[in-house]
């Protein structure tokens, strides 16, 4: 992954002129390191916060590079919603600061270093509650609003959890093959077995041996669909699918959305895609 490289003087100047500013027009400044965090912050913060997403819509967030202006915004923010280890450039800026709200530390992470904790609706419920507490500590005047909205989003996430549970009942298979290993939390929550063609890095090129291993696994387990992601080249997934006579379909890690989509709508499509691919009742 690439890391942010800024002249030392620029960083020092940004820090000096920007530290401590926590509100804009009476609203709390919240920086989100990627779309899922921005969605959560907006749902919980509502009209009492200004949320800025560091990643442009439709862009791949893993290798985000920060401009000097973004570095200053991170340093000024009251709260920065992020996931330690997911985006090294963001981690670098947050070192030594107390404004970071690390989802991984709040909800607990699996041991395989998969950063996609937000794909588990139950963990996102805990993240919403914790974020409300953090915002309330920074802005006690609006504490009741933060906690009420966190309760509402937790209810919506509970409904999403039910959607997945229902969709994945009575399935002919529990094995999924994905273009990269982004779905560990989803698999863990709903008792699926994930096999990623690539590892945790979405743009990593798998070796021919790895492709052959995954194809063998897919044949042995009766996999009929190879999943790829909307932000990743589907070439390798299509190669494996062609080799075993399978179909391809999108399974979205919700790293970014376009149009009228949001976290909930994309996740509901994921549930339907899995339901179809796994031959569920």
Roles of regions detected by a PLM:
Residues 4-7, 16-281:
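Extracytoplasmic metal-acquisition and chelation regions
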Residues 12-14:
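Hydrophobic core
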């Amino acid at each position: 992954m690439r890391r942010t490289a800024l002249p030392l003087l620029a960083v020092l100047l940004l820090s000096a002129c920007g530290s401590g500013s926590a509100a804009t027009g009476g609203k709390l400044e919240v920086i989100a390191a990627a779309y899922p965090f921005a969605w959560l912050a907006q749902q919980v913060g509502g009209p009492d916060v200004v949320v800025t997403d560091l990643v442009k819509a439709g862009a791949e967030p893993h290798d985000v590079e920060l401009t000097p202006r973004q570095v200053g915004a991170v340093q000024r923010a009251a709260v920065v919603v992020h996931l330690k280890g997911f985006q090294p450039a963001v981690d670098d800026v947050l070192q030594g600061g107390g404004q970071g709200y690390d989802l991984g530390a709040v909800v607990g992470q699996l041991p395989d270093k998969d950063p996609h904790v937000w794909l588990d609706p139950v963990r996102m419920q805990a993240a919403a509650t914790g974020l409300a507490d953090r915002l309330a500590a920074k802005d006690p005047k609006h504490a009741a609003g933060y906690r009420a909205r966190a309760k509402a989003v937790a209810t919506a996430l509970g409904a999403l959890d039910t959607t997945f549970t229902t969709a994945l009942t009575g399935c002919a298979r529990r094995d999924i093959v994905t273009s990269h290993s982004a779905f560990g939390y989803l698999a863990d929550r709903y008792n699926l077995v994930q096999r990623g063609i690539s590892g945790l890095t979405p743009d990593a090129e798998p070796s021919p041996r790895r492709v052959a291993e995954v194809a063998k696994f897919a044949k042995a387990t009766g996999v009929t669909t190879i999943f790829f992601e909307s932000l990743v080249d589907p070439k390798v997934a299509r190669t494996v699918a062609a080799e075993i006579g399978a179909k391809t379909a999108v399974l979205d890690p919700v790293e970014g959305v376009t149009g009228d989509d949001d976290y909930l709508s994309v996740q509901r499509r994921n549930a339907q895609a899995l339901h179809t691919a796994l031959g569920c009742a």
